[in-house]
Amino acid sequence: MGGSREEDRQHHNHLPSELPLGFRSSSPTTMIASSSMSKESSNYDMADFDQASLFLYLDSHDQQSIQEQRQTLNIFPSQPMHVADPAHEAKSAGVAMAMLPNGNQLQVLPSHPSKKPDQQGGQKINSSVPTNPPGPNLPLPNSAKDNKNSSLIKKEGSSSGKGATTSNDPEREGRRTLDPKTLRRLAQNREAARKSRLRKKAYIQQLESSRIRLSQLEQQVHVARVQGAMLGAGDQHQGLPSGPSAASLFDLEYGRWVEEHSKLIFQLRAALNEQMADSQLQVFVNGAMAQHDELLSLKGAIARADIFHLLCGVWATPAERCFLWLGGFRPSEAIKVMLKQVEPLSEGQLMSIYELQQAAKGTEDALSHAMDGLQQSLSDTVAAPDVAAAGGFMGHMSLAMNKISAMEDIVRQADGLRQQTLHKLQHMLTIRQAARCFVAISDYFHRLRALSTLWVARPRPEEGPAM
């Protein structure tokens, strides 16, 4: 009996070397787990089992009995629990055991998952194995690697998930735009932005109108100061006007006015080209009208100080001087200039403008006739034969000065006619037509000044030899 047990034990020790080739080619991880499990299994005491069960277990590993006996459940394995029975491995052809990462349970993994169940000859394989006996749970050598691999897999999964979300971003955006709450919020944002733009536009218009009003007030203050200086200069020297002082002040102020008016007309032309609203154009039109009123005030001051300086037109360019009428432009000529730029006009506007032009023409003729009569009377007074007498000189000079004062009245009437004509044109025309009217009149005088500059700067022919 002892000899048979010894032979069985030797036969049991040689069993691992007789494993088939498919099982020997298992992964190193499985071999390491096998060694660890074999070490743990060696800690068990064989005395815990009865002899009959032990003999039955040893007899079951006989080669002939394995081939003859029907395959049954292996309750007491002599090999490590993760190693399958060689006979069972040969019959199942491709079933491998793998240890889970925690080292507590085993799982059966078929090596050929594509094989159908009916081709396995009705063999039944246990999908679970009893857990390890109580004892110290030693970590496997490759558990750290498995944990690292699992963490890498999790990271890859998370990264792939992020990629999926980014690829689905357009779809999500489409769903968001269809959300009623989002649409309502976007509509509210657009409405708030529109109101903000309107407030900003109104604020800019208010600033622009305030700036123009401030400039007008500054001009009025400056004109009043100049008028006071001119009147003070005219009262010097026993009531005789001091011409050079008042004339120089007027020339400086007229040059400044031309510069300011050119800037305003440039802005008005830009507003017309940009198709601005009528409210904005109204500000520029009112500014242009205010500047013309300022110029007429300056002319009234210089007329009281030095009427001859205003009538001779030294303050104007040579080309402007040729078209001066009583110290300024003819209102009828200004209407003719602006009619070519303000078209189209309605029939009512044409009739009103035609009547205004005829009335201005009649007033011009009357004032021109009055001025001609005053000039002729002044010439006769100065050329009287009794002026050389001792008592007649001062009397004739007093009469001549009265005639000069009448000339001042005629010039003021001419300035009033110019001012009335411009104001009536502004009321007859629409805002855009009035803007074009002021632009046309300004361009007319600007071209006259440019013509004078070109004439003065023309190349002069060389003088011939002296006779």
Swiss-Prot record:
Residues 1-10, 145-157, 169-182 have a biased composition (Basic and acidic residues). Residues 25-41 have a biased composition (Low complexity). Residues 247-458 form the DOG1 domain. Residues 181-201 are annotated as: Basic motif. Residues 207-221 are annotated as: Leucine-zipper. GO terms for biological process: defense response; DNA-templated transcription. Keywords: DNA-binding, Nucleus, Plant defense, Transcription, Transcription regulation. GO terms for molecular function: DNA-binding transcription factor activity; sequence-specific DNA binding. The keyword Nucleus applies. This is Transcription factor TGAL7. The gene is TGAL7.
